[in-house]
Amino acid sequence: MDSLVSTRWLADQLGADDLVVLDATMHLPDNPRDAAAEYAAAHVPGARWLDLASFVDTGSPVPKAVPTAEQFADRLGHLGITPESRVVLYDDSQIKSAARAWFVFRLYGFAKVAILNGGLAKWKAEGRALEAGQTPVTPSEFPLPTRRPGTRSKADILANCDQRAEQVVDARDAARF
């Protein structure tokens, strides 16, 4: 599955048994918009609400830390996703939050995941169908994944500060750094 799919591709695929569409919209805390209310008011037909703001490691002292493998598997199970599912993520956010969701899926080895090119804004601009309310979900059992090689924990990063064995790049903008 390509990492980026078009609105036309998604429109043609809607209704496929193995396709799960997730609204991954999230706004920064200083933004007054309510992503959950926006989803409830208008979303791609059949899309489920990911709630990316809570798709984090709830036990970590680090804000917005990547969810644990257990939390990842639990959330995917609640969303009715199986290892055979194809997942398309989209957002309607200035921070392009679908990209964070895509990263988390890929981090845990979920390969059949893509981002909708242009997000909900493009979908709406093309006059495509929208739905309101919550999409009913039949939960599934999602197996516990493992993290992909190449990821580092906070402890790994702190140890590297002394060892300087690896180059670390912080991609946040200056205001968040």
PLM region spans:
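Cytosolic catalytic domains that perform sulfur/thiol-centered chemistry
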Residues: 1-177
